[in-house]
């Protein structure tokens, strides 16, 4: 193999698995270190640079970082990354004087953001400090989009939403509530705005067209029902409730039902548990509240008697799974009727754009989603950009934030007459930690502590009111115990081949056998010849230049490395060094600064 190009920013970025997995590329190890030092406000601002809403995401993020966490390779559970984000938000001081502000003198460009959800708010966060006149059009009488209407208050308190959204609106953003856009064509033809961003989410819940569907008012669409609960249009439900679907919305529906008076709630899943879309922690939280999750039941018919919903008919399924772990086929082996008073359908969401005319140059695909460039976020009509669920269908908040950052860059470039594709690349900065692991690690040995459980409000107390937040958050002391589980994956092992004397000291001391000195070969050959076979092809091998004494190469399996620094401490020549990698992510402010405009970070 050719020597690894460690100058490529993506190489060390991928080694920091949590940051690489985060769509917004939040610098997780850095903010965890700041928490460890008691610098909660700094940790909050480090989060805010990339994910904009630390307090919100510290409660409801889908956590793509945690399955990627390297800690999960040395024991069962990853670091509680998401909950540590909340620690930064809960324990910070007043940070308003550290937030970006809008300049008094505008740059003469106006942008319209349709929808006041997380994607649009991220665009506003990035563009308002650059002098853009930002107008947000929101159909509802409140901000937050699906964060407010579809995430229950017992998970995400309104005061948290209001505070973090307020930080952005205070940047001289013109917010027009109760102002739906009825016609995109009319908005564009007005020539009032230089660019338009669509961040309206995926607001249409999927229906289930089965016999009896329209014969009872007690059959509800999940996201519509949650919205009605959020606005207090619904405050009760029957004692026996069936939830159809097993995604995160289904989990919110079943737990909300309990708070409205349901006594017996069942989540009905067509497939086995291993195929669920809901996050593991969402399932655990529902089961803690005694929700019954029933697998292998495929809905067949709503049972109506004398105009009243009395139950649902299900096929009981058995599934064959192929060698790749996918369901090959399903067979109905029985039929069962389960009594109920209400049914809530939570089987997915779709985009809905009745207000976007189909003759204005915006192309839609077969699923009625706009055709959007995944880099620039612009659709097939110049000057119109999409992000969040409205761009590529339902995902989650952190994806919407990432889309918002990219769209803001593109909108800035579009308004300034620049090439949208000509974007600043990611950078990487390496700084030595030569003084030993005490300079960066939490302890001089591996910390075997198990993941801390989030403390919850007692079951007897949490159902008294619908807005009692269940998760209490970590105390500062509890946070300290959890941060010590972080392996500091951004402290990289950096190798200098010309200094190596091939003494094998690093190989001998490595606790995971991730190092091998061997003759070079192709990748498949090297993976088989390592001290411990490198089976994870998604994680690259590090291969050095030829070593000066024998011409052999140093090979490192990045997948196994736990960044313990023993190789660097043992090396007699300094060939191994521990260096902190910092990924430099460009935002709209950086693009403006590079072009000679406003300086500073829009997400600071």
Residue ranges and their predicted role:
Residues 253, 390-415:
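A conserved FAD-binding loop/helix module that cradles the flavin
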Residues 215-239, 322-394:
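FAD-site-proximal beta/loop scaffold in flavoenzymes
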Residues 88-104, 163-180, 205-260, 364-381, ...:
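Glycine-rich dinucleotide-binding loop and its adjacent helix/turn
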Residues 25-37, 44-48, 77-82, 113-180, ...:
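Beta1-alpha1 glycine-rich phosphate/pyrophosphate-binding loop at the start
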Residues 12-37, 58-88, 135, 142, ...:
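Iron-sulfur cluster-binding cysteine motifs and their immediate structural context
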Residues 105, 110-114, 162-210, 301-313, ...:
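Feature captures the FAD/FMN-dependent oxidoreductase FAD-binding
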Residues 20, 24-103, 167-169, 177, ...:
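Glycine/serine-rich phosphate-binding loop and adjoining beta1-alpha1 elements at the start
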Residues 1-8, 79, 85-107, 133, ...:
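Flanking helices and flexible, charged tails adjoining ferredoxin-like Fe-S electron-transfer domains
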